Amino acid sequence: MAQSTALTICGLVYSPAIGQELVRLHTSDIDELVYFSSEREFCNYLEARRNSVACLILEWGEGTPQIITYLHHSATLLPAILIFPAAPAPPPAGPHYHIAEVILTTDQLDQLNRQIEEAITGFVKLCPGCAVPPHVLFRLPALKESSNVDPQHRLSQKLKERLGYLGVYYKRDTAFFFRRMSPADKRKLLDELRSIYRTIVLEYFNTDAKVNERIDEFVSKAFFADISVSQVLEIHVELMDTFSKQLKLEGRSEDILLDYRLTLIDVIAHLCEMYRRSIPREV
């Protein structure tokens, strides 16, 4: 029988009032929200179930720095929301856990569901090596080892991380899908994608360029907006047509543009891999 893999929002919450508020506010279609007030129970749960956790929610308390140290030492990298008290003083500067963490105060809990989506979206853009602060990364062998990945395989590695093959990607918020955007938002997104894709093409054969980061950015935007492969193809064709006209004006051959079919194949392969892994596995 086919069924989706259960996913969980896992919290370490010291205040019963905040725990109850999380349960009341959490209406996401992710299957389950569990939280603990005991750090030991929280860690035991992660040891047993970390591969089913979609996002962590950590209420900041006296023991939180030690919990974060435990997460770093065990190379447990997950989307995370840190909740600080609502006070006149701003929360302490981060990052505390990793650079994609989302900071909330207790008077912002009404934003919980949207911020869970933000935490997941921000996290999947990061490779394991850039997710944690550098002073942590190079001090901890487990994390350092996980960061030594051939740049050409960074997206694949990210997809195999804690979220990767467990189906979190099919939990996208359909409200942000391209087909549901206003005409103005559609134009804005397409302009952003065209700009990023143009940069990818111009830098693709430059070994010094950060082209993989550009591809990751393009694919993330396209995936979470549910952009089709045919739309990506249209962006490529439009750009090649522009370049072709420019080459003709300069009296140069268009043959060079054939090389950029590799760029298109690379981008579409990354996007298709995202979509493939968004389909729940059969068990």
UniProtKB/Swiss-Prot annotation:
Keywords: Biological rhythms. Residues 173-281 form the KaiA C-terminal domain. Residues 164-172 are annotated as: Flexible linker. GO terms for biological process: circadian rhythm. Key component of the KaiABC oscillator complex, which constitutes the main circadian regulator in cyanobacteria. Complex composition changes during the circadian cycle to control KaiC phosphorylation. KaiA stimulates KaiC autophosphorylation, while KaiB sequesters KaiA, leading to KaiC autodephosphorylation. KaiA binding to the KaiC CII domain during the subjective day yields KaiA(2-4):KaiC(6) complexes which stimulate KaiC autophosphorylation. Homodimer. The KaiABC complex composition changes during the circadian cycle to control KaiC phosphorylation. Complexes KaiC(6), KaiA(2-4):KaiC(6), KaiB(6):KaiC(6) and KaiC(6):KaiB(6):KaiA(12) are among the most important forms, many form cooperatively. KaiA and CikA bind to the same region of the KaiB(fs) form and therefore compete. The N-terminal pseudoreceiver domain (PsR, approximately equal to KaiA N-terminal) binds oxidized quinones. The KaiA C-terminal domain mediates interaction with KaiC, homodimerization, and is responsible for the clock oscillation function. This is Circadian clock oscillator protein KaiA.
